Each structure stands twice: as C-alpha cells, then as structure tokens.
Amino acid sequence: MRSRTLAVAVVITASSLVVAGCGSKGEAKSTNAAGTGTLAIGASLSLTGKLAREGVLTQEGYQLCQEKVNAKGGIDIGGTKVKLDIQYQDDTSKPDVAAQLVDQFNDKGIKLILSSYGSANTEAQAAVIERNAQLMVDSAGADNKIFSKGYKRTFAVLSPATEYASSIVKAIAELATPKPKSVVFLSADDGFSKTVTEGGMKTAKEAGFTVLDPQYFPNGTSDVSSALTKVKGQHPDVIIGSVHLVEGVAIIKQAKELGVTPTGFGESVAPPTPDFAKTLGAQAENVLGSSQWTDATKGTDKYFGTAKDYTKDIQAKYGHAPDYHNAEASAACLALVLAAQKAGSSKADAVRDALSGLDTESFFGKIKFDSTGQNLYKPMSVIQIQNGKALTVWPTESAEAKMIWPGTK
C-alpha cells in the first residue's frame, strides 16, 4: 500500500458502495480527521424483497455493534486504533445479487465481509468468498449444506438449520403433558426450510412420535391453505412450520380460518420476531418457536455486557425488544472484531487464522468454531408466545416461564 496508515471499512450502504480512501485490492484504507483509520468490512443485506423484515433486524444488530465498538475507541489493530464504519448495500433478498455484491467489495479491496440474511444468500456469497480469498462471518445462514462443501473462509456464529425444528420437538417431548402422539411438518420449499424439516422429522421419529408426510409450499407465499387442507383430515397433534415470517403468520391465520386445530403449533424463525405477535395478536398465543438467542442466554463480553444489557440497548436504540436476528448479527460482528484484534491485522488470512482459534464468552453465549466453520458451543432455545411476549420455556435451566400445553384452546 502507498500509505502506512492502517485502514479498514465496514462497507454496507443502502444505495452505493462507499470505499474509504485508496489502496490495493488486498486492503481498503482511509484516515479520519483525528488521524485514526477505519476498518473495512463489506456486507450486503436484504433491505427490500421478501426477506426485508429479517434483513432490517440484521442491519440493526450490525449497527449496534459498530456503535458499541467505536464508543470504546474502536479496535486496536497492531497498536493502531481504527473505527468501524458500517455502510449498507441492498441485495434485494436475491442470492445472485448478494454474490455479485461480494465481488464488488473485492474489486474495491474489501476482503472482510459480514453476511447477508438467510441461507440462500449466504450460500451464494460463500462460494465467491472462497474464490476471492475473502473472509466472511455468517450471522444468519444456517443451512448445514453451506458447511458441507469444505469452505475454509466462512465462519458462522449461529446453530445449523437442523436444530431449529429439532429443538421444538425436544421441548415438546420433554415438557408437554399429555404428550402428543403425531406431528406433521409444513415447510417452505427453500433449502433452509427443507433442511429444518429433515432435522425435525429425524428427531421426532427418534422421540417416538408418529411423523406424517410433510407438506411443502412456495417460499415467501402468504397462502398455505392447500397444505393445511391436506393435513386437516389427518388430525395431527402438533403442526410445526419450517418457515420464515410471512409463511409463519399465514399458517396460524389460515389454520384458524380452515378449522385446523392441533393441540399445539411450533415454527422456526417467525415466532421470536416481534412482528409475529404484533400481526397475529391473540392468535399468536402459546405458539412455540425456536430461537438462536434469548435474553436469558448466559455470557458476557466487554462491548455488549450480558444478554439483559443487550436487550436494554436494542430497546433504547430501536424502540422494540430484540429478537435473535438482532443478536446473531451483533455476535457475528463481535467475532470479526475480536479476531482482527487477536490477529493484530486486517488481512483476511490473518483474521481467518484468528477466527479458527477464537474461544470466547459473549452476550450471545460461547463462540468457538469447528473445522467446518460452525460454532461448536451454540445450542438453541425454544420460546412460547405468552401474553404477547416471547418467553424462553426450554431448556428448563434457562426458562423464564413454564410451557403452556395444550397450546391451543
């Protein structure tokens, strides 16, 4: 590089890619008015399109991380203090666009990346990351398939997709009285949701449930009536949705309209999201959901404090209680920050090596990566909507409330 000033920029812009200063393709750099650099990290987000709500929650988590890190003077990289400067690029919820944006970051010399929202986008990005010798910390791409391809440059702070429905099944098997006998999975047809279903069905069979044939519908649809009609006559005790927010809301609404009345509902992704209970009102009561994080999570770190502290900060900054999309985004950013500090460098290879050896406590729980890039320590929690709030009911050692069963009246 022509200058010795260290620079890093977290690049995520809603309208245009902003690169601080100039530099070689190996490293982006800049100098602020006070003479300190900025650490460059690129990230596209689903700010519009079918995943926009989850994408905005991810953005909030990244923004809070930037605020917390910079409030403590930034990051010490080899003796030089640098600030995070997160700017956003909208991938419109499309995997091909998310991949193209990673290439654009690379063309600008941005080697450090925070992931988009969702498994399809993240999987598309991971292939480009590997090709370009970039580095990505994944906040929201949970599909196990991402980590079965031998990639060495993508690290995920979250639990894999197979755990989403499996956690709900385990909670019901352990806590539901009387124990239900049959379960059916209603699933969107995207890769993540299918993997959620596969994991849930396997766990349900192992737990002794009668598992009915799953029903699939288009990803992002708001009409799941056909799938519900097909299972209505089978009278399943439990319906579990492998879904995102839009499909999850549709299942609960249309089940009531069609008179589909299991003893309980569970869903991936949707119930912990604030919009779920807000949209459904009383219909959301007692629905179970799997969550990557709750404010009962154990652990602390110097930037965010505890899970309770994190909850207060999100509430104060954004006017709503946090959900796990916020938390996993902040945790991904935190992991990248800690690795850069540990490496004493902003070079992708050095930060990758530091991530490989990272073993730390955080507000998100413990973070340590295995050889595939997945978080070794990451369990999932199960929440239940009670009086309009998402309360942890499983595992019991971190429960905020007892699970209400039957979950429907």
Question: What do these predicted regions represent?
Answer:
Residues 313-326, 337-392:
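Segments of small-molecule ligand-sensing domains
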Residues 25-34, 54-57, 75-148, 157, ...:
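Beta-alpha junction/loop-to-helix N-cap segments that form part of ligand/metal-binding clefts
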Residues 32-65, 89-95, 117-120, 186-195, ...:
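Extracytoplasmic "Venus flytrap"
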Residues 73-82, 298-301, 368, 387:
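Short, solvent-exposed loop/beta-turn-alpha elements that line the ligand-binding surface or hinge
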Residues 1-40, 77, 107, 408-409:
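Short, low-complexity disordered leader/linker segments with a strong preference
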Residues 96, 110-213, 263-289:
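Extracytoplasmic ligand/sensor domains, especially the bilobed periplasmic-binding protein
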Residues 255-330, 396-408:
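Extracellular/periplasmic periplasmic-binding protein-like sensory domains
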Residues 60-85, 178, 208:
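Signal peptide-proximal N-terminal region
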